[in-house]
Curated annotation (Swiss-Prot):
GO terms for biological process: decidualization; extrinsic apoptotic signaling pathway via death domain receptors; negative regulation of protein catabolic process; negative regulation of transcription of nucleolar large rRNA by RNA polymerase I; regulation of apoptotic process; spermatogenesis. Interacts with CASP8, CASP10, KRT8, KRT18, CASP3 and FADD. Homodimerizes and heterodimerizes with DEDD2. SUPFAM superfamilies: DEATH domain. A scaffold protein that directs CASP3 to certain substrates and facilitates their ordered degradation during apoptosis. May also play a role in mediating CASP3 cleavage of KRT18. Regulates degradation of intermediate filaments during apoptosis. May play a role in the general transcription machinery in the nucleus and might be an important regulator of the activity of GTF3C3. Inhibits DNA transcription in vitro. Ubiquitously expressed. Its main location: cytoplasm. The gene is Dedd. This is Death effector domain-containing protein. Residues 128-191 are annotated as: Disordered. Residues 25-103 form the DED domain. The keyword Acetylation does not apply. The keyword Metal-binding does not apply. Exists predominantly in a mono- or diubiquitinated form.
Length: 318
């Protein structure tokens, strides 16, 4: 445990220079991917490479990170070649880890800005409607949204307003007013965003299906490994339970934010289990345990949040 704590707290030597460029080091990527690999995943991976990794090297593998380091020492993975790692993750159906096999740092999601904006805008719209207030106070709610707030700037709406060209011919004052009125965005016409949801059901473990069914009597170690590799790949493909990809449309920021929080805290996963893991699916897999994997694209959420924030800003315009 002390060694694990030491490795988690220390920075890899090659990572100091790459942090300035927004990149992970190869070993930091091993840490990220390896922590998500279960002990069963590591056992299956070690079983596939039993002819490549010697007994001493295999005895040092205690987790996913150690296995990836062993791949690097065998020359099967480096900063410019992740093909072997990606292929192995697909074989053990850990498609949820594929986006993490990269040296590019993932942007952190900061929902605090949304919370702050929703809180301020709710004060702005609810306060004037309060019946207990004896006299209206219009200047006070306008101060709740500071002018330097970062989401107040809306260049996209401005570009839309400037994208329409004036009509040909002479321009009168009346036509200018009509055109100005038509260019002004209608608050009722809200922008919507699509969030892609990926749901996949798979077996919890594949070790029992692989044992006794993967065999090769070829003399060459490399040919023997490839034959075992192809056999395991065929078996795992036959055990594929399928996946579903759907786009969910949102028009309200509160619903989008609630959806993202349910995804982060696992509530969405628990709710989808009752929908996708049905009795017919349980009967099809028999006594084997199955699990559900849910993935939502972080970039879709960020872009959708920006669109819906612009809707709120258009509503706030006088």
């Amino acid at each position: 445990m002390a060694g694990l704590k030491r490795r988690a707290s220390q920075v890899w030597p090659e990572e100091r220079g790459e942090q300035e460029h927004g990149l992970y080091s190869l070993h930091r990527m091993f840490d990220i991917v390896g922590t998500h690999l279960t002990h069963r995943d590591v056992r299956v991976l070690s079983f596939l490479f039993v002819d490549v990794i010697d007994d001493h090297e295999r005895g040092l593998i205690r987790n996913g990170r150690d296995f990836l380091l062993a791949l690097e020492r065998q020359g099967r993975c480096d900063e410019s070649n992740f093909r072997q790692v990606l292929q192995l993750l697909r074989i053990i159906t850990r498609h949820d880890l594929l986006p993490y096999v990269t040296l590019k740092k993932r942007r952190a999601v900061c929902p605090d800005l949304v919370d702050k904006y929703l809180e301020e805008t709710s004060i702005r719209y609810v306060t004037p409607r309060a019946l207990s207030d004896p006299e209206p106070r219009p200047p006070q709610p306008s101060k709740t949204v500071p002018p330097h707030y970062p989401v107040v700037c809306c260049p996209t709406s401005g570009s839309q307003m400037c994208s329409k060209r004036p009509a040909r011919g002479r321009t009168t004052l009346g036509s200018q007013r009509k055109r100005r009125k038509s260019v002004t965005p209608d608050p009722k016409e809200k922008q919507t965003c699509d969030i892609r949801l990926r749901v996949r059901a798979e077996y919890c473990q594949h070790e029992t299906a692989l044992q006794g069914n993967v065999f090769s009597n070829k003399q060459d170690p490399l040919e023997r490994q490839f034959e075992r590799f192809n056999q395991a790949n065929t078996i795992l493909k036959s055990r594929d339970l399928g996946s579903i990809i759907c786009d969910i449309k949102f028009s309200e920021l509160t619903y989008l934010d609630a959806f993202w929080r349910d995804y982060i805290n696992g509530s969405l996963l628990e709710a989808l289990k009752g929908v996708f893991i049905t009795d017919s699916l349980k009967q099809a897999v028999g006594h084997e345990a199955i699990k559900l994997l849910v993935n939502v694209d972080e970039e879709d959420y960020e872009l959708g949040r920006q669109k819906l924030l612009r809707n709120l800003m258009l509503q706030a315009l006088p």
